[in-house]
Amino acid sequence: MASAKEIKTKIASVKNTQKITSAMEMVAASKMRRAQERMAASRPYAENMRKVIGHVAQGTLEYKHPYLEVRDAKRVGYIVVATDRGLCGGLNVNLFKKVVSDVKKWKEQGADVEFCPIGARSVQFFKSFGGEVSAHASGLGDAPKLADLIGTVRVMLKAYNEGKLDRLYIVFNKFVNTMTQTPVIEQLLPLPKSDEEVASYPWDYIYEPDPKEVLDLLLTRYVESQVYQGVVENIASEQAARMVAMKAATDNAGEMIDDLQLVYNKARQAAITQELSEIVSGAAAV
């Protein structure tokens, strides 16, 4: 058994760790609230943009934009949004598992794959994963702006425009609630058509002054908005996961301190008993 002094040192160490995890939990809770506000503010725009694009994809257009044409999938691109930092439970691991599983299906069909990781953990993973990394972004902070992502996104759009990509997906953790964050893969290009409800009431738009000019701008902005929303959702998911992970770590530290305190008390009691025994033995010898 370890000495009482060693156990006391260990208790002090665990208490220090507990203070750190408790502070990180409170910081994550504060950041999560702000991230939720940003997510709630941008989500209606992203959802309505998706609906508009769904109608466009269903319509009969005089100008057929390349983003509306379905090509044979010979090369698939993924924009994978993960975190810059760790200590957020299995958030990144679950996301990467989903990507790897989807990549495996495409490779079985003979398609090549390339990645655009966003977030330091994503960059690190896919550089070691072995796939081609066409562009990447990290260090966006807790409140990224659309301008921070445009350059990275347009690298992938350029590849699609040049026929170097036939599919483009975005992967991120969708914020459901504080306890639940779900990794999702959403198709960006070619544009996914609307669901059955919307498709049952189709209509066409009239584009003025020029369909090509309007659609070029609209569809590019659509992709950018979906990537931005994915990043914002992932940040909210990250802070929620970190808050939960740090709370669990704080609770576990408390349990460990209680267990160590019992061991310390036993060690101290054993030491006192031994000292008393030695005193009694010494007195008897005299």
UniProtKB/Swiss-Prot annotation:
One of its GO terms (cellular component) is plasma membrane. PROSITE patterns: ATPASE_GAMMA. It is found in: Cell inner membrane. One of its GO terms (molecular function) is ATP binding. CDD domains: F1-ATPase_gamma (cd12151). Keywords: ATP synthesis, Cell inner membrane, Cell membrane, CF(1), Hydrogen ion transport, Ion transport, Membrane, Transport. It comes from the Bacteria. Gene3D superfamilies: 3.40.1380.10, ATP synthase, gamma subunit, helix hairpin domain. One of its GO terms (biological process) is proton motive force-driven plasma membrane ATP synthesis. The keyword Iron does not apply. It is a peripheral membrane protein. Belongs to the ATPase gamma chain family. F-type ATPases have 2 components, CF(1) - the catalytic core - and CF(0) - the membrane proton channel. CF(1) has five subunits: alpha(3), beta(3), gamma(1), delta(1), epsilon(1). CF(0) has three main subunits: a, b and c. Produces ATP from ADP in the presence of a proton gradient across the membrane. The gamma chain is believed to be important in regulating ATPase activity and the flow of protons through the CF(0) complex. This is ATP synthase gamma chain. It comes from Shewanella frigidimarina (strain NCIMB 400).
